[in-house]
Amino acid sequence: MAMNDPDRLRRRSPAILAGTVPSYSERLSHEPRWALAEASAFFEGKSKVQDTLRRITGRLDEMGIPYAVSGGLALFVHGYRRFTEDVDLLVTPEGLRAIHEKLEGLGYVAPFKGSRNLKDTESGIKVEFLVTGQFPGDGKPKPVAFPDPAGVAVEKDGIKYLGLPTLVELKLASGMTNPGRLRDLADVMELIRALHLSKEFGRQLAPFVRDKFLELWRMQEESGFTDNGDK
């Protein structure tokens, strides 16, 4: 094969580029004025994070790969607005393989060899993948697993997100089983507060997480939360 074969060069490019893509997270840490401007843009829907989201979901739609946005961007679209510095996507194992085969080296690089995640070479933002059939939190088998995105996604402005019940279930299961993921339980509490979720909302959740939802709901009630809405 010729040394200048374009396909060969393309396949080598992720390893070459991985160390040269500026890190969005590092820039946030080291450039406070830029970080403040970026945070302001985020809450207007105009940040590099949202640009990265639109870019990757547009590519997945073009390739026909099912996905659902999770993490902080899903929280944002459902009504709890907090800043996030990465893009989290739920995909199937087949979808993940296709993503790496078709996108790695073409605007995206792996942060390190063998990583299932990618970094957008334009923004430096990490795109993290959750995979259908795997388990949230400690990663061990449990009654709540990452579902097929095609069955749980809701669309807003042309982008598919985890539906609210699924988002809450996964965050509860994560926070319940991994002490390092207590932020997920805090996110659920903020959703309860921001959306005025009723305790009846818990009925549509998996039994494995239902009691934890009710516990968090009661904590909000005791701290002054009032149940004045049915979501």
Language-model region placement:
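Compositionally biased terminal segments of proteins
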Residues: 2-231
